Amino acid sequence: LTQDHVDYHKNFKNYLNAKLYLFQNLIKKGGIVVTDDKIPEFTKIKNISLKKQLKLFTLKNKYFQILSHNYKNEAQILKIKHKNLIHEIRVNLVGKIQLKNILMAVIAASKSNLDLKKIFSVIPRLSSVEGRFEKIGKIKNKSLVFLDYAHSPDALQTCILNIREQFSDRHISVLFGCGGDRDKGK
């Protein structure tokens, strides 16, 4: 959890409890949970999953393994191993953070018995969500312009680090604003 939405929940404890409510009360026995084992809340999610007999999957699992990751201009090339088959996938999204979301979606889809061949064929056609690493243009000096509504210190840092990693050979300029008075702690 980050500072995002704490203004609504009043404090981190309430925010965490609202998130855990999803696992404790809304997922039925035998349901699927796909999560990141690197988040601080993982142990709590794991314990709830064990208690409720939920099927827990993380990014580190025996079903999918990322073999390699490379950048190719504005795209990312992923090699994923699944059941002794290697799939090379072009991801036309900026930001390494996007890969985590894609892999979790692939795991969830696979565990929901959706056709992986179709899923892998659709990934190259994905485009950014409006306001999330969204390419909005190019200026005269050939600089790329991206829009991201990162509005917490953690989100802004993740955004900048992802852009820097993918475009390490380019100069990066950042323009950000903090409008509104809803959560002055941000």
Residue spans for each PLM region:
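A short helix->loop->beta-strand "cap" motif at the edges of active sites that frequently abuts
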Residues: L26-I32, L50-L54, R170
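Nucleotide phosphate-binding/pyrophosphate-handling subdomain across enzymes
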Residues: N73-E74, H82-K186
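Short, charged/polar "capping" segments at the starts of alpha-helices
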Residues: I39-K44, Y63, R182-G185
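Flexible active-site lid/hinge loop adjacent to a nucleotide/diphosphate
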Residues: L1-K46, P153-Q157
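Generic beta-sheet signal
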Residues: D36, L56-K60, L175
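Residue-level signal for inorganic ion chemistry
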Residues: Y15, V34, I66, N101, ...
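Extended acidic/charged loop-beta regions that coordinate divalent cations
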Residues: L1-Y8, Y21, T43-E88, R125, ...
